Regions:
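Helix-loop "lid/cap" segments that line or gate small-molecule binding pockets
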Residues: 48-54, 65-77, 85-89, 101-108
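Catalytic active-site module of serine/aspartate enzymes centered on a nucleophile-bearing elbow/loop
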Residues: 148-183
Length: 183
């Protein structure tokens, strides 16, 4: 199973709660969630405020706001054409769906899996961009809690390493899956 960011948290949750169904996991720019109730509550408040802004200011404002978050700053290297394409794809989202995602599926709504990492049975590849300092720290923490973890730091990439350096991410994933299949 492979997941990026929020999708990675969902994939990790499945690997934790149903280890018999997950042979291996690839997490790109992901975490096991917030550790404390206070952190989750703060994130829920932040996501609710962002959902309100999306409703009041509209989808264009939201997409521009999202694309300009410091987390995605490294994507500037993709160039104007790729950024315009990404913006266009994001503008095709349903605003009501985005609001529902923020309020119902955001990190603050998801449980913490930090205390349950030992339930994961299969190997896990943690992929993180070398410029994504926050998620690099989180990958180190994740790796220490997972019995069969391997970390791949992708050069010249930030949070969305698969967008910023697809060849390196693809090579790491293929190599990992080849090793998993050989077991």
């Amino acid at each position: 199973m492979l997941g990026y960011s929020m999708g990675g948290r969902i994939a990790l949750g499945l690997a934790v709660r149903h280890p018999d169904r997950v042979r291996s996991t690839v997490l790109v720019g992901s975490t096991a969630g917030y550790s404390t109730d206070a952190e989750r509550a703060a994130r829920r408040r932040s996501d609710a405020a962002l959902a309100d802004d999306l409703i009041e200011r509209g989808l264009e404002w939201f997409v521009d706001h999202w694309m300009n978050l410091p987390l995605f700053e490294s994507q500037e290297r993709l160039g104007n054409h790729a950024l315009a394409e990404a913006r266009s794809l994001r503008l095709a989202n349903d605003p009501d769906g985005l609001v529902a995602s923020l309020l119902g599926s955001g990190t603050g709504m998801q449980p913490s899996f930090w205390g349950e990492l030992d339930a994961v049975r299969g190997p896990v590849l943690l992929v993180v961009g070398d410029e994504d300092t926050r998620y690099r720290r989180l990958a180190v923490r994740l790796a220490s809690g997972l019995a069969l973890a391997q970390t791949e730091v992708v050069p010249e990439a930030g949070h969305a390493a698969h967008l910023e350096n697809l060849p390196a991410v693809s090579a790491a994933v293929v190599e990992f899956l080849d090793r998993v299949d050989a077991r």
